[in-house]
Swiss-Prot record:
Identification of the protein by name: Interleukin-17B
Glycosylation sites: 75
Pfam families assigned: IL17 (PF06083)
Record gene name: IL17B
Cellular component per GO, a single term: extracellular space
One term of GO molecular function: cytokine activity
Region (Disordered) location: 21-44
Species of origin: Mesocricetus auratus
Record GO biological process: inflammatory response
Length: 178
């Protein structure tokens, strides 16, 4: 049997052995639909279909990673210098860039997390890749991104009551470019 006939034979078998669920005239399955493995039950948290993790688990991990980065910034022995230089021996991309940047801590007590690492450009111009010196004919600008944070919403002082939290997107600088 040559390969076109084999392929046709396999196709016929797969159609014959495939799901034989009867369908009505509109193409929908008859009977009650059973939930699939990703469908939430009465006591299950829905899963994100793309990453198959619980949405709140990602947010907790995100906030934990931000907290670790802020702790590293606070405990850093490197002085907060604003020098425009590229160090190609360093692994960190923010120091190897032609528009290097450093990080500072953006603090807001009415936000969760209260501290966010925010990039600040170390050069006014950009580093020339041939001379490795700052070239002011170009401009170094911050790159902004929106990050999810929770805003603490409390009632005005005359009325005591519990604070609520609302997830909002906040724009912060995450790096610099030429």
């Amino acid at each position: 049997m040559d390969w076109p006939h084999s392929l046709l034979f396999l196709l016929a078998i797969s159609i014959f052995l495939g799901p034989s669920q009867p369908r009505n005239t509109k193409g929908k399955r008859k009977g009650q639909v059973r939930p699939g493995p990703l469908a939430p039950g009465p006591h299950q948290v829905p899963l994100d279909l793309v990453s198959r993790v619980k949405p709140y688990a990602r947010m907790e991990e995100y906030e934990r990673n931000l907290g670790e980065m802020v702790a590293q910034l606070r405990n850093s022995s490197e002085p907060a210098k604003r020098r425009c230089e590229v160090n190609l021996q360093l692994w960190l991309s923010n120091k190897r860039s032609l528009s290097p940047w450093g990080y500072s801590i953006n603090h807001d007590p009415s936000r969760i997390p209260a501290d966010l690492p925010e990039a600040r450009c170390l050069c006014l111009g950009c580093v020339n890749p041939f001379t490795m010196q700052e070239d002011r004919s170009m401009v170094s600008v911050p790159v902004f991104s929106q990050v999810p944070v929770r805003r603490r919403l409390c009632p005005p002082p005359p009325r005591p009551g519990p604070c609520r939290h609302r997830v909002v997107m906040e724009t912060i600088a995450v790096g610099c470019t030429c």
